[in-house]
Regions:
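N-terminal pre-triad scaffold of radical SAM enzymes
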Residues: 1-45, 62-71
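Short, solvent-exposed beta-strand edge segments and adjacent coil->beta transition regions
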Residues: 4-6, 52, 59-61, 81, ...
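Short, conserved beta-strand segments within well-ordered enzyme catalytic domains
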Residues: 8-10, 56, 115, 142
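Fold-independent oxyanion-binding glycine-rich loops
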Residues: 11-14, 24, 66-67, 87, ...
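Hydrophobic packing within well-folded, soluble alpha/beta domains
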Residues: 18, 40, 50, 69-75, ...
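Iron-sulfur cluster-binding cysteine motifs and their immediate structural context
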Residues: 19-26, 45-63, 74-89
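FAD-binding FR-type
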Residues: 60-61, 67-68, 89-95, 99
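Conserved AdoMet/S-adenosylmethionine-binding subsite of the radical SAM
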Residues: 94-204
Length: 204
């Protein structure tokens, strides 16, 4: 996710729905309850803790009624094996930067820095403020993006991005719509724009 030793900040929310998404929990903007079946010992702690009856045991297996789940995290707190986990939490720029700055000596020694990933990190308005804060602290910045964004969003981020890690999923527009859920026209237009401006790009 960029040169040297880096801290990757994953931001939730994505406007694509790629079949092969490696971080499907990052597609929605809000926190989500994740269940790891291989970690579950069927102790029933989560069932007893859920006030909504969203966690149930049927045929010897744990099931989650997503329509009833409040994503409160009560089940995850009592799970002894980590089979239940909340993915995503709200953090301020200051809180994120506190974590990022912990590894600043490693960035300086290795030529590393911070990488924003996701999801599509630039969908979050606070992403530019986070990039700016990193730059103000002398930290190299990279953004992993699919580029499916209004051009003005990219333009706002550009002054604070040292490297764009640009994910081109598919060149054929019809196939892109089929496997990613959206056209690639804007993605390729934004890529051409970045290339013309001389922005540092790594196309993947």
């Amino acid at each position: 996710d960029g040169p040297g030793m880096r801290t990757t900040v994953f931001l939730k929310g994505c406007n694509l729905s790629c079949f092969w998404c490696q971080n499907p929990e990052s597609q929605s903007t809000g926190p989500e309850l994740m269940y790891f079946k291989n970690k579950c010992i069927h102790c029933g702690c989560c069932i007893n803790e859920c006030s909504q009856g969203a966690v149930q045991l049927a045929n010897g297996e744990i099931y989650i009624q997503r329509s009833s789940c409040l994503t409160c995290g009560a089940c995850a707190k009592v799970c002894p094996t980590g089979a239940m986990e909340i993915s995503g939490r709200a953090m301020s720029i200051e809180e994120v930067m506190q974590k990022v700055l912990e590894d600043k000596p490693f960035y300086e020694l290795s030529g590393g820095g911070v990488t924003l990933s996701g999801g599509e990190p630039l969908l979050q308005k606070s992403s530019v403020a986070l990039l700016k804060a990193a730059r103000q602290n002398g930290i190299h910045t990279a953004v992993e993006t699919a580029g499916n964004l209004p051009l003005e969003v990219i333009e706002k981020a550009m002054p604070f991005v040292d490297l764009f890690l640009y994910d081109v999923k598919c060149m054929d527009d019809d196939l892109h719509k089929k496997v990613c859920g959206a056209s690639n026209k804007r993605i390729l237009q934004n890529l051409k724009f970045l290339a013309k401006t001389g922005a540092e790009l790594c196309i993947r």
